[in-house]
């Protein structure tokens, strides 16, 4: 490794014995041996990691070559569909990155093309999508509790109408063991069919 012959090694040992003495020489030899062992293990670790990285890079290059070869061997129909998908993806990206321009006419009758002025709301990019989402949730929760309270009552009334008897809403509620709540009428109760007597 260091091109040290037997004579040179013997000379180093004699000098070490003279300088360090017989008591400290074995400790110094063990320390130097542990340093050499650590350096060798470090060198082998670095060498192994480099060889693994080179193998991985070669493997990735071979995969890229195979992928390119398989893409070149595709049928024209598949290539056309892939190109269409890429174009659609790019168009969607452009649609979300561009801001809407205020070039619309105020009066759709003047423009002559009514289809150009009507856009579906889902294609308009939102500046604050959470605000729009919160509004939907609030509207749904405002309607749903009233609907859920009215459904058992409506079902019981409908059953009694089908039997030929006319039942009041108190009887219908009593049949379902549901106590009526005293609350303000909601939009759902306004849609309820009225009971004709």
From Swiss-Prot:
Membrane topology recorded in Swiss-Prot or TrEMBL: Single-pass membrane protein
Gene Ontology cellular component annotations, sorted alphabetically: TAT protein transport complex
Annotated TM spans: 1-21
Cell compartment(s), UniProt: Cell inner membrane
UniProt biased composition (Basic and acidic residues): 104-113, 160-169
UniProt biased composition (Low complexity): 180-197
UniProt region (Disordered), positions on chain: 93-197
A GO term for molecular function: protein transmembrane transporter activity
Keyword terms of this UniProt record: Cell inner membrane, Cell membrane, Membrane, Protein transport, Translocation, Transmembrane, Transmembrane helix, Transport
Family under the similarity heading: Belongs to the TatB family.
Oligomer and partners: The Tat system comprises two distinct complexes: a TatABC complex, containing multiple copies of TatA, TatB and TatC subunits, and a separate TatA complex, containing only TatA subunits. Substrates initially bind to the TatABC complex, which probably triggers association of the separate TatA complex to form the active translocon.
Described purpose of this protein according to its UniProt entry: Part of the twin-arginine translocation (Tat) system that transports large folded proteins containing a characteristic twin-arginine motif in their signal peptide across membranes. Together with TatC, TatB is part of a receptor directly interacting with Tat signal peptides. TatB may form an oligomeric binding site that transiently accommodates folded Tat precursor proteins before their translocation.
Name assigned to this protein: Sec-independent protein translocase protein TatB
């Amino acid at each position: 490794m260091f091109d040290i012959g037997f004579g040179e090694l013997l000379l180093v040992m004699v000098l070490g014995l003279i300088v360090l003495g017989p008591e400290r020489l074995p400790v110094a030899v063990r320390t130097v041996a542990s340093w050499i062992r650590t350096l060798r293990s470090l060198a082998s670790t670095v060498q192994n990691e480099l060889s693994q990285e080179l193998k991985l890079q070669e493997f990735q290059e071979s995969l890229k070559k195979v992928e390119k070869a398989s893409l070149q061997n595709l049928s024209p129909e598949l290539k056309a569909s892939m190109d269409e998908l890429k174009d659609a993806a790019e168009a969607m990206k452009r649609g979300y990155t561009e801001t809407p321009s205020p070039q619309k006419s105020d009066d759709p009758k003047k423009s002559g093309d009514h289809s150009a002025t009507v856009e579906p709301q889902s294609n308009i990019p939102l500046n604050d999508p959470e605000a729009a989402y919160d509004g939907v949730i609030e509207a749904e929760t405002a309607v749903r509790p009233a609907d859920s309270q009215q459904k058992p009552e409506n079902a019981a009334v409908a059953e009694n109408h089908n039997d030929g008897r006319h039942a009041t809403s108190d009887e219908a509620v009593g049949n379902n063991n549901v106590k009526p709540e005293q609350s303000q009428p909601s939009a759902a109760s306004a849609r309820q069919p009225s009971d004709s007597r």
